[in-house]
């Protein structure tokens, strides 16, 4: 079929949420002429649910996005109202940053960034169809009948695909926050042959700040110690005038109100069909599933400096409006609270992610990429991370360059994508530190050391960032080398000082680095014995040194595991493999291999239901069958 295109682009990104913004900024910064199409320009990078960025695992993803040259970290550092480091009492592998955002300012700042970006056109329009010829993307069709040519298309539609809002017995077609749903595109994605799933998520009510009795709640302040999501942010710019959050709880009266109205709850009445998030359940679901709990935490989170709206985290619900009011008024501190917005549930279509490659390109259609909630994830950070990788690979494909695949040992983003494309997901997927087997090397503090060189190679890390990174890396390497070269001897003068500090004396000579491996010896103590570095070191470099030195043994073990897995990842599986021709593999493994079509032995080994014997048989088969080949 011959199309008459009115405009032509290298890449078209459909949807301007957190995934779409990162995808379009990446492609345009890599030199591709890009169109970012959105149903509503006023909702670019909008936060329809929680007014926050980061958190456990998610905060590390934001650091990874920043290290690669993405935008989310820089944008939240410009627009937060509170910053807090989580899990400080635990090991470095699980520490992560979380920020309360001024949600309106966050969206405005991101829109300014997009509007100023070269090679990027921003357009309010609805895309109804993906145009495909001979298994390849050639463009898109708008609702007004315009056809735009494209060499690659990235679908980042969030919860808009056949979206339906549910509130009590009310159910109507809508995207998030009463925006337009994208119904025709949902139909056409299915017609293209993609398998579609149906998920559900929800949001809590918002209450008016001036109607809250804060005396009945517990204050939750931000941190005084400076922390940032972006490696380019300066401590001098750290916000001093932070806005606190507040903690309260449900109670038996709250639970009684919910239990008495379960018959009106869409989750239990049969109105909701989609699968909801396991790790962010509605309050009615929590009351039923955890009936033995006397109370549940609720955090009152301001949505910005210039609004009275307060987000009641932990109270996600689709109960009828009158029940929501009664529920709010049963809670300590909210007895007279004014509900400004009701909570609601939203159902939406997703593209089942086992149909994707690790580049986030669909296996079915060349040049078609999907990212974010479209792939079945939950959360702004997961969406942004996928959007960045999809955008990078769309640009690389257009330019005829090698693709970028982040491995599980490279980044949490790599863990997430591998989980999605290898295991799929039966519910909205959320990143957790427990999903990462190499989490000690995927830390908050070393994201730039892991990923900035990759960002530079693909063209997303500019000269200013690269220079700052090189300075930091050289300072780190030089100081590590110095600490490993200076020796402390068990002489009387040294041991007297060690004992004066309350520590065990030295029995053998050791390097300053070995001295620092003692749990009680921090960097400041070590340099008091061996002298300071040649130049003043930033606190973040010192933190990195302490972690790398104190956990060196564990880190080395993790790197050994990575090396073993790398050998399996390098063993490719051909696309034209005949799974039925492989004798002796288990029926379940054969079925999973056919469905997932793994690209490497490593990926095949991570598919649920596949055992080591199946992998051994597969490897023997591949060694004896050299004719097959994989190509995209």
From Swiss-Prot:
Organism: Streptococcus pyogenes serotype M1
Lineage: Bacteria, Bacillati, Bacillota, Bacilli, Lactobacillales
Cofactors required: FAD
Domain of life: Bacteria
Description of how the protein assembles with itself and partners: Homodimer. Heterotetramer of two MnmE and two MnmG subunits.
Residues binding FAD: 15-20, 127, 182, 373
Subcellular location: Cytoplasm
InterPro entries to which the protein is assigned, alphabetical: FAD/NAD-bd_sf, GIDA_C_N, MnmG, MnmG-rel, MnmG-rel_CS, MnmG_C, MnmG_C_subdom, MnmG_C_subdom_sf
Family: Belongs to the MnmG family.
Molecular function terms, GO-annotated: flavin adenine dinucleotide binding
GO CC, one annotated term: cytosol
Name of this chain's protein: tRNA uridine 5-carboxymethylaminomethyl modification enzyme MnmG
Protein encoded by which gene: mnmG
The keyword Flavoprotein appears for this protein: yes
